[in-house]
Amino acid sequence: MSGQAMSGESMADDAVEDAPRVGRPRDPRVDDAIRQATLELLVEDGYQATTIQAIARRAGVSAPSVYRRWSSKAELIEEAVFPSGLLAPQAITGDIITDLQPYCLQILTYLSDPAIRSAIPGLLVEYQIHPELWRQSMERSFFPMRRSFDAYLEQSGRSSIVPSDALFDVMLGALFTRALNEGADGAEEFARSVARVVTAALQPTKGA
């Protein structure tokens, strides 16, 4: 959806939405337009210039309409770049590297997105100022990913020689740092290297 897609008629729709109507459901098209505008502006103008007013103009809605959905710019950006239901290991082939290499590549490719690379430095500052935003991010995105990794290990009949949360953090930290520093350059080779490191810390589960 382009940033200008909700101008004109949509402004009228937004004005109607602004009117207080008890029980009226929120229009998901407006939510999508706001999130898309946020991602576009992060790439074009950077974190600091991506203001609520700029987002509203790009999305073709009013600033109050944005604030009714998200209490702050940081909350909106955090949700736009780190939505719920993020990545999980997929097919269990019996070969851990074969399973984990595409998973690592998926994470690295995702984190290398220009909008995310633009947002992360600003969000890290916001997390220090507003710890509740950090906790919200962990609950929505990070902890579900960690749990899905644990579930994958259990299904594959493997256990970690170190605590599995530490192993996941090492894996994600390596991918996160690479994405910020290098983007997607050499992503496939790096993802395979990380998968090999993770595999080296695994062993068959006793009794599996």
How would you describe each model-predicted region?
Residues L124, D150, S159-N181, E189-A201:
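Hydrophobic alpha-helical segments that form the core
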Residues M1-D45, A49-R58, P64:
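Basic, helix-initiating cap at the start of DNA-binding domains
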Residues S118, P131-R158, D165:
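Amphipathic alpha-helical packing segments from all-alpha helical-bundle domains
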